[in-house]
């Protein structure tokens, strides 16, 4: 199944503690239907000292958020929108904005 949200997309959070925030998708986790968005859903984790991190402590990192809780921000109209698929004349399947109709994948 084709993914409506991909790595590098700008998304807006629709619900939860970070409602209204926008950020870039860092990672997509298809098996869990989750995405990691930069600057959104920050959680604190207790880190033990190890080879990479000499000093342990409490670190802040982004946690995954469900795909249904975010909406893609259209690059042309700048609004949070649903995504559809259509085939171009050359046979490519591309994503498009359902609000303005512009193709998202170039």
From Swiss-Prot:
UniProt key word Ribonucleoprotein: yes
Keyword Transferase among record annotations: no
Annotated GO CC locations: ribonucleoprotein complex; ribosome
BP-aspect Gene Ontology terms: translation
InterPro entries assigned: KOW, Rib_uL2_dom2, Ribosomal_uL24, Ribosomal_uL24_CS, Ribosomal_uL24_KOW, Translation_prot_SH3-like_sf
Keywords of this entry: Ribonucleoprotein, Ribosomal protein, RNA-binding, rRNA-binding
Domain of life according to the entry: Bacteria
Any one Gene Ontology molecular-function term assigned to this protein's record: rRNA binding
The protein's assembly and partners: Part of the 50S ribosomal subunit.
Role according to the record: One of two assembly initiator proteins, it binds directly to the 5'-end of the 23S rRNA, where it nucleates assembly of the 50S subunit.
Family: Belongs to the universal ribosomal protein uL24 family.
HAMAP family reported for this sequence: Ribosomal_uL24_B (MF_01326_B)
Name of the protein in question: Large ribosomal subunit protein uL24
Gene name per UniProt: rplX
């Amino acid at each position: 199944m084709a993914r409506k949200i991909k790595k590098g997309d700008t998304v807006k959070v629709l619900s939860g503690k970070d409602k209204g925030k926008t950020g870039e998708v860092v990672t997509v986790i298809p098996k869990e239907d989750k995405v990691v968005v930069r600057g959104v859903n920050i959680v604190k984790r207790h880190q033990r000292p190890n080879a990479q991190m000499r000093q342990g402590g409490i670190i802040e990192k982004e946690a995954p958020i469900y795909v249904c809780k975010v909406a893609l921000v259209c690059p042309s109209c700048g609004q949070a929108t649903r995504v559809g698929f259509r085939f171009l004349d050359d046979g490519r399947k591309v994503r498009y904005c359902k609000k303005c109709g512009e193709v998202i994948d170039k």
